[in-house]
């Protein structure tokens, strides 16, 4: 059986939690392969319970599924324990959660540096969540990071923390005029936290490959979205990892020939959190109405999301760079009640019409959307469970987005509930 990649096709917050929850019903394994607790997703169960998850894969809510925090993820031990405690308090079985020994740990000094750096940048800030994600990935690339397996050997952990604080404290004290961190305090804190998750540490790369050899289905869950990818996103307003499908192999430890399909998640309109270019952004009442109707506030930060119309240029780009085979279109219900719905089909960049993503950062910043107006609908779509039950104009809207995006739309979300989904085709 296959490995299936699930990836956001916009700037994150597309509704990946619901898609993972749906696909997780046919998977035996759900693997988070990059990012950290800088992104969140909400899953609503049939009984009305909603769960906000930031680090743990949303497959944790499906009985019998083994969940993995992969080697490409950066793990804040405190957040991990808080999330586990929150799930267990609501009688969710967390015994089937494993953590890669090769994942990196977000240390207290990563969070401290992330927060003071953003404050120092002021209006020039990138808009990070201040969770220490970027500084942790910096240490990983510089080969001075602390890995999950290091908590199993206090001597190695202490050596790494001492070496790190020799430099980090210089930055905190001399550059930002902040108090330095104490080695013993950091080590003791992390070791104390590790006592509560050490039994979950495993060679997950081996276990995932063995599962595939047995014919089991593995769902590889990315966080954030394509346009936030450090290589393929709107750099420098991006995250520090590769949420695109190519990152799934590196972040989980499986080879590319294991992947059978790539499912992209598209919101029926577009949102973005933080700074950076956003060609279809609405700064008027229409944008505020979308924000309120869609509940567009970040799960992790609570920040208001920027809103705009659907952008087919970035959808086509996401299809190409991810090799997307199927799309899950979310929040179609939010557009109910609009007379017409603009869809961006191209950009005007300094007088030239382009239908593909501009090559340069300047080009993206100069992009002015070229819209096609589609007729809206007034009927309530939240109860539809087949494509044919949707209003004719809603069907036409979906078909047009499918045509513009370059991959079939196989599932459609018509509400926040787990059951409020239309499945048109079997995905992957």
UniProtKB/Swiss-Prot annotation:
It catalyses: IMP + L-aspartate + GTP = N(6)-(1,2-dicarboxyethyl)-AMP + GDP + phosphate + 2 H(+). InterPro entries: Adenylosuccin_syn_GTP-bd (IPR018220), Adenylosuccin_syn_Lys_AS (IPR033128), Adenylosuccinate_synth_dom1 (IPR042109), Adenylosuccinate_synth_dom2 (IPR042110), Adenylosuccinate_synth_dom3 (IPR042111), Adenylosuccinate_synthetase (IPR001114), P-loop_NTPase (IPR027417). GO terms for biological process: 'de novo' AMP biosynthetic process; IMP metabolic process. It is found in: Cytoplasm. The active site is at residues 13, 41. One of its GO terms (cellular component) is cytoplasm. The keyword Ligase applies. Its cofactor is Mg(2+). Pathway: Purine metabolism; AMP biosynthesis via de novo pathway; AMP from IMP: step 1/2. Homodimer. Belongs to the adenylosuccinate synthetase family. NCBIfam families: PRK01117.1, purA. This is Adenylosuccinate synthetase. It comes from Saccharopolyspora erythraea (strain ATCC 11635 / DSM 40517 / JCM 4748 / NBRC 13426 / NCIMB 8594 / NRRL 2338).
